[in-house]
Amino acid sequence: MASPLISDIAHSGLTVADLDDALVLWCSGLGFVLERTFTLDVEVTAATTGVRGAVIRAATVTLGPHRVELLQYDPPRLLESAGSPAQVGMMHIALTVSDLDRVLELCARHGWRPVGTPHRMTGGVRAGTRIIYLEGALGGFLELIAPPQLP
């Protein structure tokens, strides 16, 4: 049998406006561990991402086996209008949380706002789970998933 072409998901990436603030949220607030920081110069950024004239300051944070790459482009590219989770090609990062209300408050202090209200699933494998999407002040989406507390 031939080996698979893809063996793993290496990381999820999120472009942020302020890497230092993002690290406070993801590490101090959400409990991720800083694995490394790095910088991509103008040439490497253009070659790998197609974005010309920008430098990337980045950090990789981990939680268990999962890696999130936080990327700050300098200069940043701001959208003219906000995106939507329904926009084709839009991606989000889903986080399993133990205290949804506390994480909502923490994220709000870093510019993340709910796009709806927490919804409690009523059936299926996620019955009792509370779920909500958040949008970053400058774009991007997080999904918070709070399973019911086990006895």
Where are the language model's segments positioned?
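Long, hydrophobic N-terminal alpha-helical segment
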Residues: A2, D8-H11, L30-G31
